[in-house]
Each structure stands twice: as C-alpha cells, then as structure tokens.
C-alpha cells in the first residue's frame, strides 16, 4: 500500500513538472495553451472521481448507521428479553426531551386544575348570590302584595310595576310641560286683557284694536280688507297693527309647533309602552305562562260607534264575582279608543257566543268553590260585526259544571243595573280591583233575595234570551244572554233598541239596585 502511494506520488509529481515546464520541443506560446487544456481536463476528471467517492462514502455511512441501530436494538433485546422493545427504545437525548415535555404538561395540568377549582368556587358563589336575590325578590313580592291587599295566590310582578312606574313618570313629565305651556298662554291672555282694560281706562279708544292675541276672525277680516282694495294707510297705527299681527301669527306657529312636539313625545311614550308590553307578552308566550293569575284579555265588541270590551281572565278564582272569566265593560262609550292587551284584536273584531238552550238554562255557577280555575279557551272570530251588539263566544272545550255564569234576569232589573254600572264606569275609570270587597258584600246580601226570583227567572228566560246586556267593570257579573237562532232583522231591531236604552240611561239618574242578580239553574 505504501509502495503504491509512493509510486502514485512520483507520477503525479512528474506530471506536475511537465505541466509547469511544458514540452521543451514546443514554442513557448503553444506550450502555455497545452498546459491550460491539460489542467482543465485533469481537474474535471478529478472532480468526477471525488463525486463518486463522496457518493460511496455517503452510502457506507447510511449502512453504518443502519448497522448501529440494528446492533443497539439487538443489545436491548438481549438485555430486556422483550420482542417489542424496539418500538419503545429511545436514545438518551430523546429521553431527556420527553421527560421535559412531560414535566411541562404536568405543570400545565396543575395550573388548569387550579383554575377549574377557582371557577367552580366562583360558580358556587354566584349561585348562592342568585338564590339570595331570588329569595329577596320573592319576599319583596309577598310584602308588596300584602301591602296592596291583593289576593294571596296572585303575586305581583315587580317588572310590570317598574314598567308602569316609568310609563306614568313619562306621562307626568309630559303633562307638566303641557301645564307650563297652558300657563304661559294664560299669562299672555291676561296681559292682553289688562292692556285692553288700561286702554279703556285711560281713554285711548282710538288706538288699535289689534293686540298680541288675535282671533282667527280678526286675522281674516284684516286680510280680506287688504284683498278688497281697502289698503291700510301708512301710519304708525297700521304699522303697529301689522307688527302685532305678525307677532300673533308667529306665536301661534310657535304654539302649534309646541303642540306637535308634545304630540310626537306622546306617540313616542305610547310606542315605548306598546313595545314593552309586546316584549312581555312575547316572553310569556315563549315561556308558556299564559295561564298565570292576573292575566286578562280585553277584547272589543263592535257596537256601531260604541265599543264594549270583554275582559277574559284566564286563571282567576270562581269564588268572587270580581274574578270571573268574562266581564263586559262599555268603556268605549266615553271614547272611541280601546285598549287591547293579550292577543291582538282589531277594532272590528267580533266576539260571538253560541250557547245552546240547555246551557243557557243551566248556566249558573257555584260561587262558593275555591279550588277551581277557569281553564276554557275561546275562539275569537275575526268577522266584523257592526249592527250586532253581541256576538258568539264559542268555547273550545265542552263546558262542565264550572262554566260562565249566565243569568236570565228581568228586563227592568238589567236596565237599572246597566245604568248604575255605566255611571260607575265613568267614575271609576276601569279600576275594578278597588271595589272587590264591596261587590262581594253586596252579592252576599243579594243572595237571599235571589231565591225569591228563581221562579220568575225560569219563566222569563225564553223571552230574554235574545237581549244583549252590557256588564260592569267594578268586578261583578252581568246577564249575558244570546239566542241561537236570530234573523238579521231581529238583530237590527235589538241594536236600535239597545242604543235608545243607552241614550236614556245616560240622561236618567242611576237607581239603587244590586250590581248582580244571580239566577239558579232550572
């Protein structure tokens, strides 16, 4: 090996000298060109040899790595005696990395466990605080209900009270602004009246008749005189008249703008009120709480220009007449507006009641039962009924023993009752909860007298079936009667008679009669 290397070294040294010195037989120029070409060719061959050697060395290195790995696996198998140890064997540095990763994961797990414990403790605190607030709200509801003297089973809604309080506060602020505006107008009129009186006292009768306050007639006369050719003379009096006219018109425009602004504010308040009520109704509809105590539905009845209102209380007790499921109130006799809460009902929506003769005769309700609620639903027909004063109420379920109180009383008693209840409605303004105890006492006193009228009710029940009766708002039942087979002419005649009776009742003083007469079922 050493001899071969020595011979190779001698040969390479000889070639190197020949390349440097060149062939002595050639001229110097040719000698340099031959040397450069030979050097380039030799360098290329040398590069090829080196690249081949590099590939061979890389292949041998890969083979050596494979042999080392196989040898390590064989040694590990011999030590542990496990055939599957090859998949679990790691070098020392890889084991260190795995241990470090495991420690970091353990630290993260401990941190997450601590945060979970903290979140659990916070959740328990929040739940305890929520329970405390719920109990506090329940106690406040009970206390407020006890203070207001309401029914024990009808807990008041604090949110509803707050909403009503906000609405009343806004209306109060608006009314105060309107009062201030009216006061300013009154002061203006007073100043104009005083100036006119002073002119009369000091003898200034020739002064202008125009003041800061002008009526529409004065403005019209002044403008018509200008149009007819009677122009005002250019004097100080005419100039003052025109100035006062312009001032009065400007003040009138300002007042109109104030009125429009107040009207817009009123519309905004009413819109917010309607939106709050719609949100509350939507919440009740989603949660399925339509049958809670205290929920009422005011449904209008088409009575021509007059609109009566039926209040359907879904879940009130039967024991008191102020908490019955049907109330007919002529609230729209005072104004053409109607309040509709609960389900949406239009102005022309008709509410109709088709009762059979057996149901009309056996329609008395036992008022001494304390445990049952009205659970019947009523389908409201959307057909507008203008000439018919009272339409059909169709119960969806079959009416059992606890149904609506239908009383066929005498015509004179019902007329006096309607007059009395109409006057009470105008005075009370729809506050039927304040007169509950009085109506209950009156019912207890009237229960003894009703026994004497039971025979008359049976005999006159057929004659009074087709007569619609408008009932009270102060918490008592009225006589609801309807005929199953009625022609259009009879309904028209009844509506005309009803309007005349209402007109006579508005002028006649109310009689001192009982607000309710109950007729037992035949």
Curated annotation (Swiss-Prot):
Keywords: Coiled coil. Residues 413-522 are annotated as: Disordered. Residues 1-196, 260-287 form a coiled coil. Pfam families: CC149 (PF09789). It comes from the Eukaryota. Residues 429-438, 467-490, 503-522 have a biased composition (Polar residues). Belongs to the CCDC149 family. This is Coiled-coil domain-containing protein 149-B. It comes from Danio rerio (Zebrafish). The lineage of its organism: Eukaryota, Metazoa, Chordata, Craniata, Vertebrata.
């Amino acid at each position: 090996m050493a001899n071969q290397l020595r011979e190779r070294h001698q040969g390479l040294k000889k070639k190197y000298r020949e390349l440097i010195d060149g062939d002595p037989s050639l001229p110097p120029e040719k000698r340099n060109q031959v040397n450069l070409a030979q050097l380039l060719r030799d360098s290329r061959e040398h590069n090829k040899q080196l690249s081949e050697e590099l590939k061979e060395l890389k292949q041998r290195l890969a083979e050596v790595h494979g042999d080392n790995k196989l040898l390590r696996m064989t040694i590990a198998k011999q030590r542990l005696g496990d055939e599957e140890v090859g998949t679990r064997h790691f070098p020392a540095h890889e084991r260190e990395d795995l241990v470090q990763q495991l420690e970091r994961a353990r630290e993260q797990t401990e941190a997450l466990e601590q945060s979970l414990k903290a979140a659990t403790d916070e959740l328990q605190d929040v739940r305890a605080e929520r329970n405390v607030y719920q109990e506090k709200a329940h106690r406040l509801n009970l206390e407020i209900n006890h203070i207001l003297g309401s029914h024990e089973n009808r807990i008041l809604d604090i949110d509803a009270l707050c909403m009503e309080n906000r609405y009343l506060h806004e209306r109060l602020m608006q009314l105060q602004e309107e009062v201030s505006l009216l006061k300013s107008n009154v002061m203006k009129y007073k100043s104009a009246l005083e100036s006119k009186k002073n002119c009369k006292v000091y003898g200034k009768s020739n002064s202008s008749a125009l003041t800061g306050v002008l009526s529409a007639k004065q403005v019209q006369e002044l403008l018509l005189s200008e149009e007819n050719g009677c122009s005002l003379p250019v004097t100080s009096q005419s100039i003052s008249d025109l100035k006062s006219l312009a001032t009065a018109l400007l003040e009138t425009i300002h007042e109109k703008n104030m009125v429009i602004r107040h009207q817009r504010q009123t519309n905004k308040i009413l819109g917010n009120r309607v939106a709050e009520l719609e949100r509350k109704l939507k919440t009740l509809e989603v949660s399925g709480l339509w049958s809670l105590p205290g929920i009422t539905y005011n449904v209008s009845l088409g009575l021509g220009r007059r609109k009566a209102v039926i209040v359907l209380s879904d879940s009130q007790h039967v024991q008191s007449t102020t908490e019955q499921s049907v109330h007919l109130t002529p609230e729209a006799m005072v104004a053409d507006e109607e309040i509709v809460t609960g389900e949406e009902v239009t102005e022309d929506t008709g509410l109709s009641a088709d009762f059979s003769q057996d149901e009309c005769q056996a329609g008395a309700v036992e008022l001494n039962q304390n445990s049952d609620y009205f659970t019947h639903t009523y389908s409201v027909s959307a057909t507008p009924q203008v000439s018919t004063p009272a339409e059909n109420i169709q119960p969806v379920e079959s009416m059992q023993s606890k149904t609506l109180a239908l009383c066929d009383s005498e015509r004179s008693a019902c007329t006096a009752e309607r007059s009395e209840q109409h006057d009470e409605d105008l005075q009370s303004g729809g506050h039927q909860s304040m007169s509950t105890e009085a109506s209950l006492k009156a019912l207890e006193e009237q229960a003894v007298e009703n026994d004497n009228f039971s025979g008359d009710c049976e005999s006159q029940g057929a004659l009074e079936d087709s007569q619609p009766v408008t009932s009270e708002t102060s918490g008592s039942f009225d006589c609801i009667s309807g005929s199953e087979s009625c022609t259009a002419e009879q309904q028209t005649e009844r509506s005309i008679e009803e309007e005349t009776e209402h007109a006579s009742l508005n002028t006649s003083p109310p009689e001192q009669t009982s607000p309710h007469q109950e007729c037992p079922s035949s």
